Amino acid sequence: MSKRRVVVTGMGMLSPVGNTVESSWKALLEGQSGIVNIEHFDATNFSTRFAGLVKDFDCTEYMSKKDARKMDLFIQYGIAAGIQALDDSGLEITEENAARVGVAIGSGIGGLDLIEAGHSALVEKGPRKVSPFFVPSTIVNMVAGNLSIMRGLRGPNIAISTACTTGLHNIGHAARMIAYGDAEAMVAGGAEKASTPLGMAGFGAAKALSTRNDEPQKASRPWDKGRDGFVLGDGAGVMVLEEYEHAKARGAKIYAELVGFGMSGDAYHMTSPSEDGSGGALAMEAAMRDANITGTQVGYVNAHGTSTPAGDVAEIKGVKRALGEEGSKQVLVSSTKSMTGHLLGAAGSVEAIITVLSLVDQIVPPTINLDDPEEGLDIDLVPHTARKVDMEYAICNSFGFGGTNGSLVFKKIAE
């Protein structure tokens, strides 16, 4: 059967550099860092004392305080981004179309804040003091659940959780649901709030985080020789995906077309990528096959680019492998994690939005802090300054613990 076309008609975002898509995009193009010192708990004894935090978030713009008390912050962030995306799309939910509009929003970790609080209540005060809302306030599918309740969305309701590939996988699978007729529209993405004591301690114990405590805004430096680990970030990114003819019929504005989705597994290591980049390459190759394009047609790759010694090099090897010699010579590759940090389960969806905006505005955001590039990469990593470009296709990559990889291909919509 022939697939139906899928387009992006709405976007919403909370990130360390802005609480809307517009403010985040402006900050990224200007090369602003959203990394700050941690002040919401005492991080004195932690090896890493900074993160990419959401600032000045007011939950009452999106829900009542009563409802918010039953939700971990990752749920609140996801709902906020979802409401932004739905409002941006102009898609009206009616009794007639509700069953054809679904939600696919996940989280890599879920409600760490309230898990920690629930455990403290159990240990210090006993089982009767654990909140009756403990489970629904922390599990990963409750962004999708709560948003569907708030907006009356009765189509497919899922929450894929695949570590740092969560947001991208939810978008990719939501697109396939539309392509194969399960829905006319899907609200898709990821949300995360892992900058908690347990989250910071866990990633710190794994030696995954940068410890550049004297220069937090310079800590996330993908492909730079001085990189020493990733910077944890919080936030949410959500898209409204829609069947093309459905979007056209209602006069929706269309940002871009999602033409390719690919997945793969490294089958290599619990936390490290395959050194030759072959796992990531398989995902990119699958996405390009799905899009029916070659490597020479790709203008931009929004890289996973986390600022880890092994991962950054492996990804560039994968890009070269997937795009080929000619494609690699002309493509621009950048990592916006240099500014936002790594949003874990929200990274792929936030960066998918960034990739779409790059196509819309024909400009590539920079990789900041790339002062001394790793030798031998031989690819344009867009250091320091955003770059205007003429392109039709762009790729977004996400790779996660356990070797779970995903790539999306977006296409510019013709005027």
Swiss-Prot record:
Among Pfam families, the record links this protein to: ketoacyl-synt, Ketoacyl-synt_C
Residue ranges of domain Ketosynthase family 3 (KS3) in the record: 3-412
EC number(s) reported in the record: 2.3.1.179
Q: Which PROSITE patterns match?
A: KS3_1, KS3_2
* Entries under InterPro entries matching the protein: 3-oxoacyl-ACP_synth-2 (IPR017568), Beta-ketoacyl_synthase (IPR000794), Ketoacyl_synth_AS (IPR018201), Ketoacyl_synth_C (IPR014031), Ketoacyl_synth_N (IPR014030), PKS_Beta-ketoAc_synthase_dom (IPR020841), Thiolase-like (IPR016039)
GO BP, one annotated term: fatty acid biosynthetic process
Gene3D superfamilies from the xrefs?
Answer: 3.40.47.10
Provide the GO MF annotations for this entry: 3-oxoacyl-[acyl-carrier-protein] synthase activity
**Catalytic reactions on record:** a fatty acyl-[ACP] + malonyl-[ACP] + H(+) = a 3-oxoacyl-[ACP] + holo-[ACP] + CO2; (9Z)-hexadecenoyl-[ACP] + malonyl-[ACP] + H(+) = 3-oxo-(11Z)-octadecenoyl-[ACP] + holo-[ACP] + CO2
The subunit structure is:
Homodimer.
Q: Which family does it belong to?
A: Belongs to the thiolase-like superfamily. Beta-ketoacyl-ACP synthases family.
Q: What is the protein's given name?
A: 3-oxoacyl-[acyl-carrier-protein] synthase 2
Lineage of origin:
Bacteria, Pseudomonadati, Pseudomonadota, Gammaproteobacteria, Vibrionales
